[in-house]
Curated annotation (Swiss-Prot):
Pathway where it operates: Amino-acid biosynthesis; L-histidine biosynthesis; L-histidine from 5-phospho-alpha-D-ribose 1-diphosphate: step 2/9
Main location: cytoplasm
Localisation per UniProt entry: Cytoplasm
Protein name, entry field: Phosphoribosyl-ATP pyrophosphatase
Alphabetical list of InterPro entries matching this protein: HisE, PRib-ATP_PPHydrolase-like
Alphabetic keyword roster: Amino-acid biosynthesis, ATP-binding, Cytoplasm, Histidine biosynthesis, Hydrolase, Nucleotide-binding
């Protein structure tokens, strides 16, 4: 199975459930609570990912990274930003030094 297919299916599932019944869907429940709650979850998952990495627990790191990506995709969906736009930005940056890319943004 292609990894991109997994992300595309996840994005479609999130979009489908976004406006669903909050009692039946975690995605709908998060969206019903608003953007601030979704953003809070992204922050929490980011912190948990960092903690797992520093603890050296590979299995926990993989699980937390998956949670982080999921919640980031929920946030992007809530803001009507297709994941393809993020991938396009990564493609645009490919082959560019991180230092040079950052300098180009500060001008």
């Amino acid at each position: 199975m292609e990894h991109g297919e997994i992300l595309a299916r996840l994005e479609a599932t999130i979009a489908e459930r976004r406006l669903g019944d909050p009692s039946a869907s975690y995605v709908a429940k998060l969206n019903a609570k608003g953007l601030a709650k979704i953003a809070q979850k992204v922050g929490e998952e980011g912190t948990e990912t960092v903690i797992a990495a520093l603890a050296g627990d590979r299995k926990e790191l993989v699980g937390e990274a998956a949670d982080l990506i999921f919640h980031l995709m929920v946030l992007l969906s809530a803001k009507d930003v297709p994941f393809a736009e993020v991938l396009a930005e990564l493609a645009r940056r490919e082959g560019t030094s991180g230092i040079a890319e950052k300098a180009s943004r500060s001008n």
